């Protein structure tokens, strides 16, 4: 019997253009693919290939400089065409020109039921997939020398315009279960699902403890689920795994090969059709997004969802943890008479400033990317706590991070948060602070202090 956890705090933001599972987005065959190290938070990449080298799918393109046994696999076989670098020689991406006929390194099929935790770790390390596992504290890609007290997988994606994992799960049920079984060999594994998710592969998942979350966004955040099930204290570590990565792990054990195909949602009001595209990690966005845009001007293209995603361009690629590509109006061409004072029904407000609240919570809004105000002092108390379903004082924690008071941060629970946990709080924040950026900087400083 699943444990049902009801959450009252949070905020559902219904945006126009949610992806339909019945719409298949065509994908143009790309000549080049690229692996982007920035998708793996906390990893300093050390490139282990040279331009002109030939790699198979599954061969390492770079390793974690701090932990060289953690490799990162090429999504395709082909010739390494470029190692792009930015300021201070930061590695931006490694490009691979795909072969006409793809070849994969064979790591050998494995029966996960017969493996122990050490063997599972070793298999993931050899195949270049271990880096897809994140950890709390610090919300970074983990390393094999950490010993997790538990592993958390959240199959609930409830951010605005987020992809429905049940669409991606269809046809991958066996791989998903195999991945869960493999993780359960390392530590006790918790699977979090939503009250409206009815897939048998989720409801009848084996070798995991199933928890059903009933509440508004961000109930699907794995950090929120950790906070309600097994909070992280100083000195403790939990691993968190994206559900798409669980499928990658399962495929590895079932086939012996690295297969990084995933279904990515194409969503937002600026898309002609909102649906799902079957792509590889590293696929250029131009191969499947460009043809779907209504226009290329006054549009905010986002690698991810509007709350936690990153502003991007057609020159970017599908990231390791990307589950949706969204497009919303930029808002730089708007000219509104009387501004926010004008009564209206098409604007979203958490404080009932507009008449739109009369239409109920299910009304969809076509919001743009404007902040509508400048950064200012933190005067409104309690705003964060209304939408943060965690047993922490969010406002005081943010102030402690800004002040650089590490002792106070530890007392207020910084070890169990991720930047995405403050995404909804950032949306409602009348002070217009970049809360996710503040949290990330605080976690990075704390990680360096504790190294």
Can you say where each PLM-predicted feature lies in the sequence?
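Buried, small/hydrophobic-residue-enriched core segments of structured protein domains
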Residues: 70, 84-287, 291-451
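Generic structural signal for buried aliphatic residues
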Residues: 55, 61-62, 285
């Amino acid at each position: 019997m699943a444990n049902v956890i009801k959450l009252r705090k949070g905020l559902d933001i219904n945006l126009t253009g949610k992806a339909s599972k019945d719409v298949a987005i065509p994908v143009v065959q790309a000549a080049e693919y690229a692996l982007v190290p920035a998708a793996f938070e906390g990893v300093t990449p050390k490139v282990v290939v040279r331009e002109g080298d030939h790699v198979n799918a599954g061969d390492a393109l770079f390793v974690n400089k701090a932990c060289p046994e953690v490799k990162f696999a090429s999504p395709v076989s082909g010739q390494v065409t470029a190692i792009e670098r930015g300021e201070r020689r930061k590695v931006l991406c490694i490009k691979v020109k795909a072969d006409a006929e793809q070849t994969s390194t064979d790591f050998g099929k494995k029966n996960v039921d017969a493996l122990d935790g050490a063997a599972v770790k070793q298999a993931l390390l050899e195949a270049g997939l271990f880096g897809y596992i994140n950890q709390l504290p610090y919300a970074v890609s983990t390393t094999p020398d950490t010993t997790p007290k538990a592993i958390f997988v959240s199959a609930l994606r409830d951010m605005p315009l987020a992809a429905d994992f049940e669409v991606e799960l269809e046809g991958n049920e066996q791989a998903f279960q195999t991945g869960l079984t493999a993780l359960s060999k390392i530590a006790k594994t918790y699977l979090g699902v939503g009250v409206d998710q009815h897939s048998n592969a989720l409801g009848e998942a084996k070798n995991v403890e199933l928890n059903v979350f009933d509440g508004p966004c961000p109930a699907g955040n794995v950090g929120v689920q950790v906070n309600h099930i097994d909070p992280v204290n100083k000195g403790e570590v939990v691993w968190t795994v994206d559900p798409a990565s669980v499928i990658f792990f399962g495929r590895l054990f079932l086939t012996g090969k690295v297969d990084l195909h995933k279904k990515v949602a194409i969503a937002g009001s600026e898309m002609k059709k909102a649906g799902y595209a079957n792509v590889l990690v590293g696929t250029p966005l131009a191969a499947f997004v460009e043809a779907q845009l209504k226009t290329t001007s006054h549009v905010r293209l986002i690698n991810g969802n509007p709350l936690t995603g990153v502003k991007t361009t057609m020159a970017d690629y599908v990231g390791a943890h990307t589950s949706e590509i969204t497009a919303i109006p930029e808002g730089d061409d708007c000219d509104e008479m009387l501004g926010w004072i004008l009564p209206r029904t098409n604007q979203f407000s958490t404080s009932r400033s507009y008449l739109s609240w009369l239409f109920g919570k299910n009304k969809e809004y076509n919001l743009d990317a404007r902040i509508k105000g400048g950064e200012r002092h933190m005067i409104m108390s309690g705003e964060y706590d209304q939408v943060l379903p965690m047993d922490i004082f969010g406002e005081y924690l943010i102030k402690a991070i800004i002040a650089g008071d590490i002792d106070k941060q530890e007392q207020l629970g910084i070890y169990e948060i991720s930047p995405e946990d403050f995404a909804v709080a950032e949306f409602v924040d009348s002070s217009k602070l970049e809360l996710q950026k503040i949290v990330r900087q605080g976690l990075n400083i704390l990680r360096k202090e504790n190294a």
